[in-house]
Amino acid sequence: MFENIKAIFFDFDDTLQSRAGAFRIYCSDFLSRYFPAIQGEAKEARMDEMEAHVDGGYKSREEYWPEMIALWGWQDAPDLDTLVADFNTNFGKNVVMLEGSIETLKALKARGYLLGMVTNGNSLLQNTKLDTAGIRDLFDMAVVSDDIGIWKPDKGIFEYAMKTLGVTPEESLFVGDHPINDIQGALGAGMHAVWVDYGSFAGQATPGVPVVKNVSEILKILKG
């Protein structure tokens, strides 16, 4: 099925790194800076509230922060621009790579595959994540949707990635966790796809698309 693959493209959040794990660290840091008097169980409870309202990272910051301000009755809250900037600047400094992800990238690189990264999100935030993770050098290209104005699942961002590496859809494999943004988007661009199912989108497998529980399983389904 994947005999002619030359390039493998990856999503980042919840494919290679645990967004929830990284966000938990950010929540703790945020509360320490803005609410230093809140400690112990009270701090944990507020971190839980931050996690519960972020919608897995798919809610816009412009919608998220007003919700938190209202929930907490935060009378002296900074303005929205300040809070959005805090998120985009500081969240990316916390990265929790998923088990086996870095080792898998290195193994694929050693096999001679070209590696690409295609991730949705704010440019500063996502680029900071890649730098914090220390994996940028493993990739032959990386594109953040915000940098080119095209967001997954629009096929344009996948076509941009393939053009950058000089490969055709038949020579390209996309690996991601989101059944629409990653899998349907890649298929719409003519690419092959593998769905990494960590359980967030249970029951949303795409017929004919291989499913793995961890990116390391890709090594078993690729020749070589």
Predicted regions and their residues:
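Residue-level marker of alpha-helix boundaries and capping positions
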Residues: 56, 95, 117, 173-174
